[in-house]
Amino acid sequence: MSHQSDLIATDIDAYLKQHEQKQLLRFITCGSVDDGKSTLIGRLLYDSKLVYEDELAKVQSDSVRQGSVAGGFDPSLFMDGLKEEREQGITIDVAYRYFSTAKRKFIIADTPGHEQYTRNMATGASSADLAIILIDARHGVLTQTRRHSFIVSLLGIRHVVVAVNKMDIDGVDYSEDRFNEICDDYRSFATRLDLPDLHFIPISALNGDNLVDRSENMPWYTGSTLMNFLETVYIGSDRNLQDFRLPVQLVNRPNLNFRGFCGTIASGIIRKGEEITVLPSRQKSKVKEIVTYDGNLDEAYAPLAVTLTLEDEIDASRGDMIVRSGNLPRSESDVEAMLVWMNEEAMVPGKTYLVKHSTQTVPGNVETLAYKVDVNDLHRMPAPTLELNEIGRVRLSLSAPIHHDPYRRNRTTGAIILVDRITNATVAAGMILDRGTTGSHKSVWDDEVSTDDSSDALSTVTTEERAARFGQKPATVLLTGLTGSGKTSIARAVERKLFDAGRSVAVVDGEFVRRGLSRDLGFSADDRSENLRRSGHLAHTLNDAGLICLASLVAPSDDVRQKVGKLIGEDQFLVVHVATPLDVCRERDTKGQYAKADAGELSNFPGVTAKYDVPTNPDLAVDASTTSIAECADAVVELLKLKGFIK
């Protein structure tokens, strides 16, 4: 129901425009059985005068007939619409309710509290911005409270209100001590969850205490009422406006002169003229038009439904994804995810399911189950399978790559569901994890062999023989610095000098590696680590062949640089810091990457939106803003001579 306004009678167009511009907040109520979730929502609507008269009369009549509340009406009947729900006094399915106030529009999902309906609760929470977790003041924090809190955290809901309900009950009597006791108990559990914005409000849902109006029965509470908090909580920063993702739903071809790619923007912003990449083909083009039902736009953002036309004829179809060229998602056929199992039939490791991800559907199987989670204490337990409503971490092996982001970063492109191929039933909901997230799967760095296990150990040609043939010792020189510092220019100049001197040398350029070996990686810290690991392997292989390798890479993490040194061999690994100042790097930026990073269009960009660890003890430091490229190259050559790699 909409907020009543005088504009409805005087200027309906102005009212509709005002209503259209209100921000929408989606929230859920959850908690254990009979904690008062439906009662809370019903009373919230009633006290806000957002209930129709005929609906109120029906609820009052049903309250008298059922006798569910002594001496008054039962607000929960506004939400429990199923006959079984009203007869049993419980919520079975998710009930959605829309209403608005003068400040904001709301969509409420009233979720069931019984354990057997946990899957229904997870469904309601999947699109919520905020969660209200109810706790009965008599019973405190229960197992189902913990279960729902864990799911709320798992599904990335950042804003949580713990509403301690039934403060009016005999034995509680609006006690501040009891409220504080429950808050402390919940906090001790919540410290192990990712709940960054947590608030506590004492309420009586049946009587309306601290819902819309401040309670006279609890003068010791000086915080916000529930409605005031819902109207004012800031959710703007929750939106991902950096990573542009458009899963293609269909190709619109109404005539020979128009070909557009339709879909709902999952995240980010796109503008006319910007370069895009279509996955998985990796073809590039530029946005020609952004077409919508209401006319063409110069820019569009999530969650608008748009049709993009491109400057070039590119082959794309449903299941493909259009992204900004400088910000690619991961494209992988092996992913790790947390699953909420939602089917009566237990999960079967190795069984093939259909994995639905955005507009893409691919067959896949659960390769391994790392552990399941005991929601009562959050301990991880080994298990052969997942039963109904259980939660666990799995590794999925898919028949084709999916283009995804970690769920923590992008709730749309990080979400999957598993479907039974025979019954077509949804059996699980999954949240894709970031590479390297704590779990049973080791970091790929942990699997690295030592330099003693190099290909040289299997070759009939020894390192010494290669050194004698080439007249040099193999080495890798890592030139690290910010984008635009001059790393690659110096590497190419050194290559020329060494080659002209009769040396065998090769350059590993970061952009070259990104187009080949690391084309499936993005630019998160984990992806940069993996990119450097692969580049390190390439450099190590070149060293095994007797070559001097010049690796030009940003390599922002000091920890990862040290790992590369161990991978290659510290006795043949040199670090050159190209210490060109940031302001000079910005001036040299011909691709506009720094400007995009400043505008929030490029995430994890070293020097702007991500940290660059300045090498503390490099073998050489040069400043390409005060020293010419040729002089920098000479310094690198002298370093190689000083270390004995060349004469």
Swiss-Prot record:
Give the region (G5) as residue ranges: 204-206
Provide the residue span(s) of the region labelled Adenylyl-sulfate kinase. Answer: 473-614
What residue stretches are annotated with the tr-type G domain?
22-239
Give the highest taxon in the source lineage. Bacteria
Query: Which EC number(s) does the record attach to this protein?
Result: 2.7.7.4, 2.7.1.25
Q: How does it assemble?
A: Heterodimer composed of CysD, the smaller subunit, and CysNC.
Q: What is this protein called?
A: Bifunctional enzyme CysN/CysC
Q: Which organism is it from?
A: Rhodopirellula baltica (strain DSM 10527 / NCIMB 13988 / SH1)
Its lineage reads:
Bacteria, Pseudomonadati, Planctomycetota, Planctomycetia, Pirellulales
What gene makes this protein? cysNC
